[in-house]
UniProtKB/Swiss-Prot annotation:
Signal peptide: none annotated. Pfam families: HTH_8 (PF02954). It comes from Actinobacillus succinogenes (strain ATCC 55618 / DSM 22257 / CCUG 43843 / 130Z). The lineage of its organism: Bacteria, Pseudomonadati, Pseudomonadota, Gammaproteobacteria, Pasteurellales. The gene is fis. This is DNA-binding protein Fis. Homodimer. Keywords: Activator, DNA-binding, Transcription, Transcription regulation.
Amino acid sequence: MLEQQRNPAEALIVSVLNSQSQVTNKPLRESVKQALKNYFAQLDGEDATDLYELVLSEVEHPMLDMVMQYTRGNQTRAALMLGVNRGTLRKKLKKYGMS
């Protein structure tokens, strides 16, 4: 019998290839943390600007792309899945050139 997941976010697992060429699964949040650590390390003491927008767009664009594929372009279904109204979805699709 399959166990039910307690938190839907637990389903957001990223497969990562580690240094020994082994695939490991880790939560999306851990991948975001690691990406930010790498980003900060590359700043070399410089200040970051628009970090929130940078991270949001890196996650939002592929999420919208996959949801639109899953719903076969049905914006009403996609908006329901995402928990946003259809007008908001349309604005986001336009922002990323997906309309």
